[in-house]
Amino acid sequence: LSLRRQRQMCIRDRDRTYKNAIELMKSLGVGIKEISIKDACIQHMNDIEHDESVKDITYENTQARERTQILFDMANKHGKLLVGTGDLSELAMGWCTYNGDHMSMYGVNVSVPKTLVRYLVEYVAHESDEKTKEILLDILDTPVSPELLPPDENGKIAQKTEDNIGPYELHDFFLYNFVRFGFDKAKLKRLAQKAFDGTYTNDEIEKWLNVFIKRFFISQFKRSCIPDGPKVGSVSLSSRGDWRMPSDASFEDFIK
């Protein structure tokens, strides 16, 4: 966005990702502000009478929406633009909290699939100084996670996105061929079997294709109200542009 780095503000999460976030911000010379969401989330869960020991979707989304509220309020306070980090793959799969990370003032990555994000980060890493490169490559080596659940007993990330919804390289493949060419389930499966022969079994492809179709259909309501963002490639899910779909469309006929 051609903004001076010193005028950009970043807010962090925890542990390995926390260390990388802090070191990357220092390396890039951007402003750093650390705000804890713990007390606010505990207060909110008390207000709605939710037991904070129950690590369910309410527990997770409370954190996601509190993060977003802080970011919006900080943007208002400083008269700045809240730039969203969500990408095309997350939007397709609905892997975002409605009115949490789903929302921003401008979705700069909204038409960039997750697999391309990785290539872009790797490219920037190799174009950067050694310190920044080291940090970015470690970020690429970190499991994809919203980090809304506590870490495991070793302090490692326990909530891994691809363990829950499947490999992004498969989902991005399904997404491109479904939206760009309108292929049905049978053809998507045949193409994936050819493209990923030796990487995924037929049963794995079938399993994750069913997950993709179901999540894509039931997540349309999130895509019907998203912030503005650029169209980068040949596939876009903006309801104001390339993609129009009723939010109550059923996946059941398509998945047969």
Put a short name on every predicted segment:
Residues D56, N61, W95, G100-M105, ...:
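Peripheral terminal appendages
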Residues L1-I11:
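Single conserved hydrophobic/aromatic residue that forms the stacking wall/gate
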Residues L28, E49-E130, L148:
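Active-site adenylate/phosphate-handling loop in enzymes that bind or generate adenylated species
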Residues R14-T58, A64, E90, I135-P146:
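A conserved beta-strand->alpha-helix junction
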Residues C10-T17, K33-I37, Y59-E66, N109-P113, ...:
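Catalytic cores of large soluble enzymes that bind and process phosphate-bearing ligands
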Residues A21, L71, F174:
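Aromatic/hydrophobic pocket-lining residues that form π-stacking "cages" and hydrophobic walls in ligand
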Residues Q8, E23-G31, A40-I48, R65, ...:
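Generic, well-ordered alpha-helical scaffold segments in large soluble proteins
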Residues K33, L82-G84, R118-Y119, H126-D141, ...:
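Acidic/polar loop patches that form or flank catalytic/metal-binding clefts of enzymes
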